[in-house]
């Protein structure tokens, strides 16, 4: 059994660690609430844009308009993956779940004879892609907790330009997929994979009761609005990923703090037992000495 002094030192060390994890839990809780507010603040604009895109896409399909971002390519041999991860760790299994999902996606695509390029948003995802030797076309790191839309645009531009045919009819990607953390609730954040390009018609297409009038023309509005729609979709995914990161970190630090408290209780019990054993031994030695003197 360790000495009482060593146990006291361990108790002090664990208590100090518990203070750190408690502080990180409180900071993450505050950042999570702010991230949730950011998601809610952008939702009205995103919802209205979604409604307009639903109506506009339906009209475009009915009118025979073929926008390159709406049209699937005849064959799929080159795929891009937009991978959104946190820049930092200490957020439970969130990073490992995302990187495992990315690895499964890449393996599945390669098994179908497709090449995969990655657009990484977040340091953890970028580092993972470089570590496994996968092709990295673009990266964005250090976005922070409340990134402006302009900081996200390079990733969206890379995806749009890679999917859209150039003047010669050539393009870099046949499909683009998005992998990010879906914020279900404070306790649950899970990887979410979906096709990003070509743009699919919103599920509410034709459901709106508003009769929109487009100026100067429906085609011109579609040309301008469709890239904005893609950018907003990516921006919303990033904001949701940030909320997931802080929620996962808050829960991880809460669990760490609870474990620290439990460890302190166990160490305190061990310390008390060691102290009791030392006192009992000392009393026994005194009693034995007194008995020897009386004889």
Curated annotation (Swiss-Prot):
HAMAP family the UniProt entry points to: ATP_synth_gamma_bact
Function description: Produces ATP from ADP in the presence of a proton gradient across the membrane. The gamma chain is believed to be important in regulating ATPase activity and the flow of protons through the CF(0) complex.
GO annotation, cellular component aspect: plasma membrane; proton-transporting ATP synthase complex
Family: Belongs to the ATPase gamma chain family.
Locations listed in the record: Cell membrane
Protein keywords: ATP synthesis, Cell membrane, CF(1), Hydrogen ion transport, Ion transport, Membrane, Transport
Protein name in UniProt: ATP synthase gamma chain
InterPro entries linked to this entry: ATP_synth_F1_ATPase_gsu (IPR035968), ATP_synth_F1_gsu (IPR000131), ATP_synth_F1_gsu_CS (IPR023632)
Assembly behavior: F-type ATPases have 2 components, CF(1) - the catalytic core - and CF(0) - the membrane proton channel. CF(1) has five subunits: alpha(3), beta(3), gamma(1), delta(1), epsilon(1). CF(0) has three main subunits: a, b and c.
Coiled-coil residues: none
Name of the gene: atpG
GO molecular function annotations of the record: ATP binding; proton-transporting ATP synthase activity, rotational mechanism
Superkingdom field: Bacteria
Recorded topology in the membrane: Peripheral membrane protein
NCBIfam families per the UniProt record, alphabetical: ATPsyn_F1gamma (TIGR01146), PRK14111.1 (NF010709)
GO biological process: one example: proton motive force-driven plasma membrane ATP synthesis
